[in-house]
Amino acid sequence: MSFRGLNASSGMGVADHSKNTFLELKRKKVHRYVIFKIDEKKKEVVVEKTGGPAESFDEFAAALPENDCRYAVYDFDFVTSENCQKSKIFFIAWSPDSSRIRAKMLYATSKERFRRELDGVHYEIQATDPTEMDLEVLRERAH
C-alpha cells in the first residue's frame, strides 16, 4: 500500500471493537490497558492486546513492541495527597526511535483522528523510549 492511497488528514478508520474495548476500560474497568495497532490491510485501528485490571504497569510497558509503533490507553490509579483514590486515563502514542520511518509517519498521521474517538482520555503522552512514559511521568501528570 502506498501513502498516496491514504488521506493524511483523516488517517485510518477505527474499528468498532477498538471503541468498545476503550469504553470497557473507561466505564467497566475490565482492562488496565489496551494496546492498539494499525491494520494496514483493513485500513483501521484495531485492538492488539488488553491487560486485565490486576496487571501492572511493568507488564503494560513490556507488552509494547521494542521496534514498532502503537497506540495505547492506560488506566492509572493513584491516591491523592488528600488520601482520595483517583483514576486517570492516559493515551500513549508509542513511536520508538528504532521503528521504521514509514510506521512513524502512518501512526503520526492517524493519531488525531483515533484520539478523538476516545472520549474520556485525561492526558496524552508521546513516547519514543520507555523513560518518557514510566510511572513517575504518569504520576507527575496525574497530580
Swiss-Prot record:
Which Gene Ontology cellular-component terms appear in the entry?
actin cytoskeleton
PROSITE patterns, sorted: ADF_H
Locate the ADF-H domain: which residues?
Answer: 11-143
Instruction: Answer yes or no on keyword Acetylation.
Output: no
SMART domains per UniProt: ADF
- Cite the Pfam families for this sequence: Cofilin_ADF (PF00241)
On the tree of life, the source organism's domain of life is Eukaryota
The UniProt entry, under InterPro entries, shows:
ADF-H, ADF-H/Gelsolin-like_dom_sf, ADF/Cofilin
Q: Which GO terms describe its molecular function?
A: actin binding
Q: Which UniProt keywords apply?
A: Actin-binding
Q: What are the BP-aspect GO terms?
A: actin filament depolymerization
Q: Give the protein's function.
A: Actin-depolymerizing protein. Severs actin filaments (F-actin) and binds to actin monomers.
Q: Which family does the similarity line name? A: Belongs to the actin-binding proteins ADF family.
Q: What is this protein called?
A: Actin-depolymerizing factor
